[in-house]
Amino acid sequence: MKLTCVVIVAVLFLTVWTFATADDSGNGLEKLFSNAHHEMKNPEASKLNERCLDAGEVCDIFFPTCCGYCILLFCA
């Protein structure tokens, strides 16, 4: 019985601690939904429209956009 109470208190404390130390807990969902709304109005802004490069195409080492891996400037 005592162990159960201690566990409940610990979980409640950790939950409160998580919400109290969150960086942007008040505006997080609002920003998420406004970005999603912007992407619906402007489909080009969506990251899902970016095409990955097939094997054998030239890729960039620093910003690879390959479907697989970027090895020696070519997608694998």
Curated annotation (Swiss-Prot):
UniProt-recorded Gene Ontology molecular function terms: calcium channel regulator activity; ion channel inhibitor activity; toxin activity
Residue stretches in coiled coil: none
Disulfide-bond pairs as recorded: 52-67, 59-70, 66-75
Compartments, as annotated in UniProt: Secreted
Keywords noted in UniProt: Calcium channel impairing toxin, Disulfide bond, Ion channel impairing toxin, Knottin, Neurotoxin, Presynaptic neurotoxin, Secreted, Signal, Toxin, Voltage-gated calcium channel impairing toxin
Propeptide: 23-50
Pfam hit, one: Conotoxin
Free-text comment about domains: The presence of a 'disulfide through disulfide knot' structurally defines this protein as a knottin.
Protein name: Omega-conotoxin-like TxO1
Source organism (scientific name): Conus textile
